[in-house]
């Protein structure tokens, strides 16, 4: 979302070159710039494979903030404006955000309402970028295709943690066991936090639980 604010303010463009030849800011945010999970060495040509990459996210943020503090940048662009008083960056941009369940609920709802972003920017972020690329969702395996937006994952036809939510649903989960999933068209969202790190328990539990949450939300 913070990069979307930069785009709305005219400070950056998703099409601007970044990293390897042919790569852009959009490639980095959609995990298609060719980096490995924790390596800046090329694992695939740019725009040919979806390889989830913390390095790509960190590199994109570093390129945007320059000498500024990433924590302050996120607070200025997102946290303060949405009223996320319990949320802060306490580590690397790709995996260092901590906060409360309440704040995560507010954050998920902001995507539904497009709080802090132009609607057109929100919709672009949640639309697949190079949607036909194959790739791997960490913990859930390989998918053909493996659609991803400009930050959040897009479900598409993947049968995994998003359960039976519609193809245009988007969200993210982390190694902490937290998740956020939302569908703008249906105007529903679900979040969860955990005291147990992501693992086999989540792979087995989330799909059915998340499907049930959607059923209950649409019936309410």
List each language-model region with its residue ranges.
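Secretory-pathway/luminal and periplasmic proteins that interact with or process carbohydrate-rich
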Residues: 20-23, 34-39, 81-89, 130-137
């Amino acid at each position: 979302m913070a990069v979307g604010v930069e785009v709305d303010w005219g400070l950056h463009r998703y099409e601007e070159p970044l990293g390897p030849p042919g790569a852009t800011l959009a490639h980095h945010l959609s995990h298609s710039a060719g980096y490995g999970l924790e390596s800046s060495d090329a694992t695939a040509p740019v725009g040919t494979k979806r390889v989830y990459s913390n390095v790509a996210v960190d590199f994109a943020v570093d390129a945007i903030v320059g000498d500024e503090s990433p924590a302050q940048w996120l607070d200025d662009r997102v946290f303060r404006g949405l009223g996320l008083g319990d949320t802060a960056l306490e580590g690397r941009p790709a995996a260092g955000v901590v906060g409360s369940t309440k704040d995560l609920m507010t954050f998920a709802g902001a995507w539904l309402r497009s709080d802090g972003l132009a609607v057109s920017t929100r919709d672009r972020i949640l639309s697949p970028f190079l949607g036909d690329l194959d790739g791997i969702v960490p913990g859930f395996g390989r998918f053909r295709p493996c659609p991803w937006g400009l930050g959040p994952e897009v479900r598409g036809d993947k049968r995994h943690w998003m359960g039976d939510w519609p193809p245009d649903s988007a969200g993210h989960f982390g190694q902490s066991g937290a998740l956020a999933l939302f569908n703008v068209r249906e105007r529903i969202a679900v979040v969860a936090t955990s005291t147990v790190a992501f693992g086999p328990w989540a792979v087995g539990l989330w799909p059915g639980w998340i499907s049930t949450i959607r059923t209950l939300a649409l019936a309410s």
